[in-house]
Amino acid sequence: MTTEETKFQPKDYKSDQYVRWCPGCGDHAVLNCLHKAMAEVGVAPHNMAVISGIGCSSRLPYYMNTYGFHTIHGRGAAIATGVKTARPDLSVWLITGDGDCLAIGGNHFIHAVRRNIDLNIVLFNNKIYGLTKGQYSPTSDRGFVSKSSPYGTVEDPFIPAELALGARGNFFARTIDVDLKNTTEVLTASARHKGASVTEVLVNCVIFNDGIHKGIVDKEYLSLIHI
C-alpha cells in the first residue's frame, strides 16, 4: 500500500513520550485535536515538521510522532521559515504561546505572516507566562494582577487577529480548547490552506490563570470580548 493510499489514524501522530503538562491544562486538548486534524488531512507523519519556541505549549513537538524542533525563545517562526524554505514538501507547523510569539518573537511572527510562506502557526493564548510561574503577557488584559504586575498592568493587550491581519495575513481563525470539534475543524482548514495561516487557540492555565476565558465558555457570565 502506498503512502497516498494509507489511511492514517490520530494514534499514528502520537509519540511515546510522557506528556508533561499539568492535569487540566488546555494544551492537552489542542494536542489531541492536532492529532485528529492530521489524520483527517492525511499528511504522513514523516512529511510533517513541528517547530516550537519556549514555553509550556512549546513542548508539543515531543508529543508528535513527526519531525520536530524545540528551538529558542521567540525564534520559532524564523526557524520554521527556514525549514519550509529548505523542505517545501513538508507540512510545517509552528507551535507558540502568547509570550513566546508576541513579546520576544513578535518581529518574527509578523514577518512570517507578511511573507505568506506556507506555514501553519498555532498560537496558544492563555494570557500569562505559565512556564516562568505567572507573569503578565502581551495578551493580558489591562489591570491584570500578576507576579510582575502586583498593582495591575497599565498596558493594553495585543489582539492576535489585529496583528495577523495588519501584517496582511489571509487566514486567521480563533477557537477555544474546550470546543474540540471546532478546534479540529479549524486546524484541518489551516493545514489545507496554501500560505501562512494563524490559528489562535484560547487555552486555560489551571495553575496561574484559571478561568481567564470564562466569559466565552460560561453562558451565565457576562463579559465584553474583543477580537
Short names for language-model regions:
Residues G106-V113, L131-F144, L163:
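Active-site-proximal loop->helix
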Residues I225-I227:
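Conserved small/polar residues in nucleotide/adenosyl-binding loops
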Residues Q17, A44-M48, A86-V92, R114-N120, ...:
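Short coil/turn connectors at secondary-structure junctions
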Residues I54-C56, N126-I128, D179, L202-I207:
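Glycine-rich beta-alpha junction loops
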Residues K7, K11-I72:
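Active-site diphosphate/adenylate-binding microenvironment
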Residues D89, S137-R192:
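Conserved thiamine diphosphate
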Residues C56-G130, N182:
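Thiamine diphosphate
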Residues W21-P23, L94-T96, F171-I176, V198:
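Short catalytic-loop micro-motif centered on adjacent basic/acidic residues
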